């Protein structure tokens, strides 16, 4: 995004950095919650846990959708701006990046399917407890941010506009020095 040097791609890159911090932070929290219960991060150790942890499964799916850039959630805004702003300058690289977005979506959905769907595949998962009040109160603000930014991207864009313009002008200045 930033390397394309265009205003739209730079603005998208800044927004994507913010969104990645929110979404990746939420995913790490969620993985940590599960690790505290089972003391493993091995995907094959799970299966069917949405039966015992339905709130956790719903929040993990929502966060996964935000991570892969589903429209209406925060991950879409920056990714779309980056791809649109970069395409004119770097058609092949932008196409490869768009393919990477598709691969990331496939992986996230594959992981979700293995961990959450189907019957419970490990007896240790039968006694897993769903999110407690502390965990719920710590993850919900991030979930609300993902939704808010996805629905009202202009709000976060209003904070980014000036910086994106400054970076665009700086890049243009350095192009003129050559």
Over which residues does each language-model region extend?
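Cytoplasmic/organellar membrane-interface segments at the starts of transmembrane helices
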Residues: 53-55, 108-178
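Functional transmembrane alpha-helices
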Residues: 1-129
């Amino acid at each position: 995004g930033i390397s394309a040097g265009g205003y739209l791609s730079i603005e998208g890159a800044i927004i994507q950095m913010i969104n990645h911090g929110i979404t990746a932070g939420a995913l790490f929290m969620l993985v940590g919650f599960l690790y505290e219960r089972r003391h493993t991060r091995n995907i094959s150790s799970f299966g069917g846990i949405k039966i015992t942890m339905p709130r956790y499964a719903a929040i993990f799916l929502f966060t996964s959708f935000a991570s892969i850039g589903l429209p209406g959630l925060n991950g879409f805004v920056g990714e779309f701006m980056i791809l649109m702003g970069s395409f004119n300058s770097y058609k092949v690289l932008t196409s490869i990046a768009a393919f990477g977005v598709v691969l990331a979506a496939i992986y996230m959905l594959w992981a979700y399917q293995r961990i959450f769907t189907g019957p419970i595949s490990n007896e240790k998962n039968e006694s897993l407890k769903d999110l407690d009040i502390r965990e719920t109160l710590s993850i919900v603000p991030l979930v609300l941010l993902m939704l808010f930014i996805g629905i009202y991207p202009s709000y976060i864009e209003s904070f980014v506009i000036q910086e994106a313009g400054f970076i665009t002008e700086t890049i243009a200045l350095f192009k003129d020095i050559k």
